[in-house]
């Protein structure tokens, strides 16, 4: 087999700003694994600096992992992910891209979509939220909410000195929508509790990562006093993080770019369920190639946030969609992703 890659720069329709900053352009890496007879599997890496990755470090990681991939038996999906993790502890986006490409390859070999490899029913996928990033003004915020009119579930990014004003504006502009909030680790525990009172008043469904990723005592403090479910995102990267989050958070947010592969994502779901926790999955800014890989396990989730490609002005792929919030998983073999 041969491991190849190419780099692309994609652009969001609006600057995607969260509590720790933002940008409009994003470098992504497409991974191609080509078997000896020409069958290809595709995957996508969306490196994120918060988790110690950039496009440059991702390329270096790919070079290091290439010998493992090119010598592997693609049918041994679990074994390959184990070998990748032994070779590199971090670089989750690169490992997840390789994992997705191998699943794509095997699905194409068998002529079935990846979700069928796992025995899943796509009709059981939850609605996806659509993210409203931090806007510069109330007028801009209302404009973005209007543009998201077809989405029944909105995820609101907070973590500013205007948070109460933002969430009240959103509720006023979208009185009938389900609202979820993501503070991206921006609040102190006590401020989180003050904000949760406002969120409850505004009918918010849950709050995601209210405090710093490392502050598990602070998150436990919030969770024990909160009337809203608390979901751990930045605090939950891989499956071994989950046991220490029991009693600290009500649920976890899985992202392929964090956890490093589809097998690991399935493992995280199983472990969280065993502990009675809620399970959601999210994304970085990704094209439909990256989003579709995660969408194949959407039927196992309580909540989904698969809007990464919907936020783009220039998505180069066709794959899973979230029209009206409903996740439509491709029926084609493998991931079912094609170029536009």
Model feature map: region roles:
Residues 156, 161-291, 296-298, 313-325:
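Catalytic core of soluble alpha/beta enzymes
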Residues 1-179, 184-193, 197-201, 225, ...:
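N-terminal capping/lid subdomain adjacent to the active-site entrance of alpha/beta enzymes
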Residues 301-305:
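Short helix/strand-capping turn motifs
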Residues 106-109, 296-300:
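Alpha-helix C-terminal capping segments
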Residues 309:
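Active-site cofactor/co-catalyst pockets and adjacent glycine-rich loops in catalytic enzymes
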């Amino acid at each position: 087999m041969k491991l190849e890659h190419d780099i692309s720069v994609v652009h969001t329709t609006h600057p995607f700003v969260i509590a720790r900053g933002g940008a409009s352009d994003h470098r992504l890496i497409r991974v191609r694994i080509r078997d000896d007879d020409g069958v290809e599997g595709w995957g996508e890496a969306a490196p994120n600096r918060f988790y110690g990755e950039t496009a440059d470090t991702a390329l270096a990681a790919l070079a290091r992992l290439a010998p493992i991939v090119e010598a592997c038996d693609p049918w041994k999906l679990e074994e390959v992910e184990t070998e990748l993790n032994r070779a590199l502890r971090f670089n989750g986006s690169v490992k997840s891209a390789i994992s997705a490409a191998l699943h794509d390859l095997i699905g194409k070999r068998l002529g079935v979509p990846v979700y069928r490899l796992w025995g899943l029913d796509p009709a059981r996928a939850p609605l996806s939220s659509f993210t409203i990033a931090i806007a510069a003004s109330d007028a801009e915020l209302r404009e973005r909410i209007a543009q998201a009119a077809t989405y029944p579930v909105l995820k609101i990014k907070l973590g500013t000195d205007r948070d109460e004003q933002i969430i009240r504006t959103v509720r006023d502009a979208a009185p009938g929508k389900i609202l979820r909030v993501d503070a991206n680790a921006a609040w102190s525990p006590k401020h989180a509790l003050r904000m949760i009172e406002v969120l409850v008043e505004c009918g918010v469904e849950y709050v995601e990562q209210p405090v710093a990723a490392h502050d598990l005592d602070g998150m436990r403090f919030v969770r024990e006093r909160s009337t809203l479910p608390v979901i751990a995102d930045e605090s939950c990267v891989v499956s071994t993080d989950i046991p220490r989050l029991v009693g600290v958070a009500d649920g976890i947010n899985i992202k392929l770019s964090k956890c490093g592969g589809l097998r690991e994502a399935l493992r995280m779901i199983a472990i969280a369920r065993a502990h009675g926790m809620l399970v959601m999955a999210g994304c970085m800014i990704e094209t439909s190639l990256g989003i579709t890989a995660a969408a194949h396990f959407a039927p196992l989730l309580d909540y989904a946030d698969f809007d990464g490609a919907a936020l783009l002005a220039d998505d180069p792929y066709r794959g899973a969609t979230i029209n009206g919030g409903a996740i439509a998983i491709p029926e084609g073999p493998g991931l079912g992703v094609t170029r536009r």
